[in-house]
Swiss-Prot record:
Tissue specificity remark: Expressed in roots, stems, rosette and cauline leaves, flowers and siliques.
PANTHER family named among the record's database cross-references: EXOSOME COMPLEX COMPONENT RRP4, PNAS-3 RELATED
Subunit architecture: Component of the RNA exosome complex. Interacts with RPP41.
GO annotation terms (biological process): maturation of 5.8S rRNA; negative regulation of post-transcriptional gene silencing
Annotated protein name in UniProt: Exosome complex component RRP4 homolog
Length: 322
């Protein structure tokens, strides 16, 4: 486990507490994982009697296997490689991603995904606003800006890779599409682990949380996923809605906005500490801030970072005992 150095001013007491918490975390991590954290030129233990394959991040020098990058040693059968930390997003087909539209082009939107290439969302690869499955027409192409414009935040799924290395996205489900009434956060992609569920609804708080595999995380007011038939039935009503009604619909209650900010700051703290970002850890951090009556803006201070590190060490120790 590679911990980050906290870039915040700490008092002498806070520094001692923080270092003690990090030592506990590192001891728990090293005893729980067989994977070894390495830096450049570290020796990687291998059995030379058995054949092994040198993978990415390794090099053999004088019969010894050395790491050429910082990261965690991974072994797949005979292959030995080093998984780098703090690297850019490495996409896989089926990944749930959150991104920001940077260009509206011919029959497509280009989306920034924290990857070395932009994602491409084709007009034909998403549900139309009317919810009807049909061929896309020239009228649909002319109305593309009514769906997404530059700087819109969207959620989609990685469909495949194009010949130029860019990602082809798809948003054919009602759970994908434009994200509104919330905030977008960015963490290092290695802090997000792929799982079966990346869409979360925190019912007690009325908040939607989308943890993108690319390190972009969306925190927003809960939005019900509407059935396509319901969308079609409400189409006429939406067409006659007034601008004042639209303003009312865009209003977010103060309590909801405060909750979004609290969850957002919890994610920022976890990112600063280099902790894996999961729903469980996020909500525990939020509950910790509430139990200690810490204001939203104070969550980004040094003291709360130390408290979170101590709490995470205790959580992992308790979890290991079970």
């Amino acid at each position: 486990m590679v911990m980050r150095k906290l870039q915040l001013p700490l008092s002498q007491t806070q520094k001692v507490r923080f270092e003690r918490a990090i030592e506990r975390l590192q001891s728990l991590s090293s005893s729980a994982n067989s994977d070894a954290s390495v830096i450049v030129t570290d020796s990687i233990p291998v059995n030379h009697d058995d054949a092994f394959l040198k993978g990415h991040g390794t090099s053999e020098v004088d019969g010894e296997l050395l790491a050429t990058v910082c990261g965690v040693v991974e072994r797949v059968d005979k292959l030995v490689y080093v998984r780098t930390l703090r690297a850019r997003y490495k996409p896989e087909v089926g990944d749930i991603v959150v991104g920001r539209v940077i260009e509206v082009a011919q029959k497509r939107w280009r989306v920034e995904l924290n990857f070395n290439q932009d994602g491409v969302l084709m007009l034909s690869s998403m549900n139309m606003p009317d919810g009807i499955q049909r061929r896309r027409t020239s009228v649909d192409e002319l109305n593309m800006r009514n769906i997404f414009v530059e700087h819109d935040v969207v959620c989609a799924e990685v469909r495949n890779f194009q010949h130029d290395g860019s990602l082809q996205l798809q948003a054919r489900s009602q759970k994908y599409g434009k994200l509104e009434k919330g905030q977008l956060l960015k963490v290092d992609p290695y802090l997000v682990k792929r799982s079966k569920h990346h869409f979360h609804y925190v019912e007690s708080l009325g908040i939607d949380l989308i943890i993108g595999c690319n390190g972009f995380i969306w925190v927003g007011e809960h939005v019900e996923v509407r059935d396509p038939m319901a969308i079609d039935d409400q189409k006429d009503e939406e067409m006659i809605s007034s601008s004042s009604t639209g303003k009312e619909q865009s209003h977010i209650p103060l309590e909801t906005r405060q909750t979004i900010c609290r969850i957002g700051n919890a994610i920022r703290v976890l990112s600063n500490l280099g902790f894996t970002v999961t729903l469980e850890v996020i909500m525990e951090t939020v509950n910790l801030s509430n139990s200690k009556n810490i204001d939203i803006h104070d969550m980004l201070g040094s003291e709360f970072h130390v408290v979170v590190a101590e709490n995470e060490a205790e959580r992992r120790r308790t979890k290991r005992k079970k």
